[in-house]
Amino acid sequence: MQRRDFIRNASLALAAFGLPSLPACAASKSGQMGLRRLGQPQPFDFATLKGQARALAQAPYKSHKRVLPGRLEGLDWDQYQSIGYRQDHALWADQPGKFQAKFFHLGLYFHSPVRMFDVVDGKAQELAYDGAAFNYGKSGIKDGELPADLGFAGFRLNTRKDTDRDFAAFLGASYFRAVGKEGQYGQSARGLAIDTGMGKPEEFPDFIAYYLEQPSADSETIVVYGLLDSPSVAGAYRFAITNGDVLLMDIDSALYPRKAIERLGIAPCTSMYQVGENDRRMAWDWRPEIHDTDGLSLWTGAGEWIWRPLLNPRNLRFNMFVDRNPRGFGLLQRDRNFDHYQDDGVFYEKRPCLWVEPKGEWGEGSVQLVEIPTVDETFDNIVAFWNPKEKPQPGQELLVGYRLYWGAEPPARPPLAHCVASRTGLGGVVGKKREYFSWRFAVDFEGGELARLIDKGEVEAVVEASRGRVEIVSARPLREINGYRAMFDLVPPEGSTEQIDIRLFLRSGGKTLTETWLYQYTPPPAGAPERTLY
């Protein structure tokens, strides 16, 4: 599987598929400040965009990637980051509404021009690229050096009260991200994932055009439309984005496959996990923990709540959680303690959770989790998405709706106690010689009824393992969090390095008290340091 090689294939000429194609000289005069408009406004709505996507799917796929002109092709990270969009060219900056949009320049990883349209009163008009709209900083690029029809890489949204801080950004392939009140970017979402974690190159669809609908003066929501294209599928997306303490994206999509898709990923979440409390395989850094998110949360169609801590595995790891009509899932950052990260530059403790809430019934399928080894926090190595059981076929229309919530807390939480920490280490009894290898797990739960049961001592830990032996099981009050700590040792089969699946929950008198904690443990090979400590 390819990692980080996801920025590919953006739009060039789409006139044959329903988008107007106009030369720069056809730019129309506009009373609005900022970018010029091209041609005359054309009627536009979501049905129009679906028609464009359907037409794309009926034609052979053509790559949208291009070689960038001049110095753009060789920019490094610092040079690209120094290119900024000028406030006096921001879209809607002169309008009475609360929001405005700014645009990203092509360069670095972003080689695919994306067409931008302004939608006013149900009519769309393309926005013309203008080099004068950018400050080129340390890039070495001079105003007027680049072609007049270069195009954009993406866009960002902010409020007119805070023109320097984004609350959402769409940039690269079909990637987009947003923030809650903490104002810190972290994980990303994608329009679609195709063949992720299959041991072959992943396909990364591109948003090749965006239509930004001008909001009314008192609107709290901004609507964005995206046209998606890839070798396997074309699609139309509608995003209704409501900024707030928890940012909401209400999404409707229509997909039109060009060919059968082996593994289709709906509502994909993309994150990074390098080092955490439970997995210290890559703990070479001075910081105790390094991750955008620390676990996958699932609310199944049957009503069960599941928490699966993330891992940075030695080899690519793929898991599927079979379900029917899931109620929600997401990659969460539950650990909000700065002391656990000690990074005052990127603030991992402020990074948003991303919760997916299906609209309607999604039927049979599975939430799939892909974990990829990484040695660097700049590599996104975690992907979670919904994979429908029925594989979409060419000629079909697949309609999918869902909501994305970005913020410190997801909108849905277990009524039971939830896991707040998962720690692991060498097993055995302190002060006694270890006769065999074992690995210890300490899992902390808080919430629900646990605080009421602290003084009653009626809580037990229920642990199951797919192989090996579980021993020294306990559930003890943890007054510091008004909760409980479950502990147990796992003894793998002698000489085995085969993966072991573990399931844990707390109960009292036959009543379940916590969400279900799932884990995958791989015993170390013979000669590994942890096997020599007994």
Curated annotation (Swiss-Prot):
Pfam families: MdoG (PF04349). GO terms for cellular component: outer membrane-bounded periplasmic space. It is found in: Periplasm. Predicted to be exported by the Tat system. The position of the signal peptide cleavage has not been experimentally proven. Keywords: Periplasm, Signal. The keyword rRNA-binding does not apply. InterPro entries: Gal_mutarotase_sf_dom (IPR011013), GH-type_carb-bd (IPR014718), Glucan_biosyn_MdoD (IPR023724), Glucan_biosyn_MdoG/MdoD (IPR014438), Glucan_biosyn_MdoG_C (IPR007444), Ig-like_fold (IPR013783), Ig_E-set (IPR014756). GO terms for biological process: beta-glucan biosynthetic process. One of its GO terms (molecular function) is catalytic activity. PANTHER family: GLUCANS BIOSYNTHESIS PROTEIN, GLUCANS BIOSYNTHESIS PROTEIN D. Probably involved in the control of the structural glucose backbone of osmoregulated periplasmic glucans (OPGs). This is Glucans biosynthesis protein D. It comes from Stenotrophomonas maltophilia (strain R551-3).
